[in-house]
Amino acid sequence: MGKMIVFLFIIVFGFILKTMYDAGEFKTLEPHYSGDCSSVTGVVGAEDITFLNNGTALISSDNRRSRINGSEAQGTIYQYKPRAKNHKLINLMPKLDTGFHPHGISVYEEPDGKTYLAAVNHHSSGLFNSRYGHSIELFIYDSDSLVHVRSVSGPLMISPNDIVLINKDQFYVTNDHGSSSRIGQTFEEYLQ
């Protein structure tokens, strides 16, 4: 009996050490950026950032903590112009029902200047509802606003994380999990 307890302890301890190692607990990160870094204030829950050819940044943001606490707050896409003096964040989202909770974003700029934005959306209800729980929202970006074009969803989007627009009608999307259940995703994370 005593040997079995020691054996189980070693297995559990080894699993904990492996998980800590995989999570980077024993790594030392050294700064290696010699440029200036500045913080953009006012963005809560920034998930992704992409730049237009003119240097304008588009930032996806969703206050996930407020949703955990029961808030119906909608996520957004901000515009930020880092080269402009005293530039303020501009909330680009059109007035929509709740249900927009962005993750990864991507832009595609056509030669004629028309710009498209795609955003991974993790929704549970609202305007962009789909039976799959996730969708890709496609917008037209026009200087200081977004116009919603359409939603795309399907069974292959199990847990979409990021997106790359190839053109206004095609994109690649990554799933960060293969399982759609919470328990399956937890096993994927810890039993890689």
Q: Which positions does each model-derived feature cover?
A:
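Short extracytoplasmic
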Residues: 37-63
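A short helix->beta-strand "capping" segment at the edge of beta-propeller domains
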Residues: 22-44, 85-91, 145-146
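Residue position within the beta-strands of beta-propeller blades
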Residues: 58-60, 119-120, 173-174
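Asp-box/WD-like beta-propeller blade repeats and closely related beta-sheet repeat scaffolds
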Residues: 93-109, 114-170, 178-181, 185-186
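Beta-propeller blade signature
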Residues: 73-84, 131-143, 190-192
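Positively charged n-region of N-terminal signal peptides that target proteins for export
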Residues: 1-4
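Blade-loop segments of beta-propeller domains
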Residues: 40, 45-46, 64-66, 70-111, ...
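Blade/loop signatures of beta-propeller domains
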Residues: 9-35, 75-80
